A protein has these predicted regions:
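Active-site and donor-binding regions of nucleotide-sugar-utilizing enzymes
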Residues: 9, 13, 17, 32-36, ...
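Non-catalytic N-terminal targeting/anchoring module and adjacent flexible stem/linker
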Residues: 1-93, 110, 123
Length: 239
């Protein structure tokens, strides 16, 4: 398929519809079935996060759905482990300059319980020239040092492979940027089923706040971070 270069946010109508679908799944006792079969997506959970922001006790309501979603992903992994199957993990870098996961990648690579791959993802909302330069540089970086790399984007034709063309959606995805709307749509977190566990490794660590104390909330209380199972940062110092 051709890469869609348009950055798209959820409309208010989409947010309401997706949040209602998630609510209906729980009320009709279909959540587990729809989650296990991949019918419920992270778009549903993000919509619920956005829909509950202005509600009284909205945080409490959102956390109820969040915990259900996290359990779905963890249960899938536990089942695979109990059946003796390997856990498939994919890292999604967007740039060679933002590779903050070397340590954990090598640890997982050397553990035979895991199957690890790196999937460089092209950026959207920019010129073909800029996207091509960044993507090729990223692929060269990972291709030169014995990483298991899956290239998904043809810079000449603008064709992009989906998850099904590179071995399927993994069990765990390690995200390396929180700006998910700026990567290829088919690899955005909104497209992932709720039975996938998502981790984010930050490329920086902020230990301060603004005088109004709003910066911390602005930076960390985002939809993306609120649907992660865990958020980590690489540091050589124990804070």
């Amino acid at each position: 398929m051709l890469l869609d270069n348009v950055v798209k946010q959820m409309s208010q109508e989409e947010i309401v519809n997706l949040a209602n679908e998630l609510t209906d799944a729980v009320e009709k006792n279909k959540f587990n079935m729809l989650c296990e079969t991949g019918k419920l997506k992270y778009a549903h959970l993000i919509a619920m996060f956005l829909a509950t922001q202005a509600m009284d006790d909205g945080r409490k309501l959102y956390l109820y759905f969040y915990k259900l979603a996290m359990k779905c992903g963890k249960d899938r992994i536990i089942s695979k482990v109990n059946n003796g199957n390997k856990i498939k993990i994919a890292f999604l870098p967007i740039s060679a300059s933002e590779w903050q996961a070397e340590y954990i990648y090598r640890k997982l690579e050397n553990d035979n319980r895991f199957e690890v791959e790196i999937v460089p993802v092209p950026l959207i909302g920019r010129s073909k020239e800029d996207r091509t330069a960044i993507y090729l540089q990223t692929c060269r970086f990972f291709g030169s040092d014995k990483y298991n790399v899956k290239e998904i984007y043809d810079t000449e034709t603008e064709e992009i492979k989906g998850w099904d063309e590179i071995g399927g959606i993994p069990d765990i995805i390690v995200h390396l940027t929180p700006w998910y709307l700026n990567i290829a749509p088919s690899y955005q977190i909104t497209k992932l089923p709720l039975n996938v566990v998502n981790i984010y490794i930050s490329y920086s660590l902020s230990i301060g706040n603004s005088k109004t104390e709003e910066w911390e909330s602005y930076r960390y209380n985002q939809d993306f971070l609120n649907v992660m199972w865990k958020v980590y940062t690489e540091t050589h110092k124990d804070f």
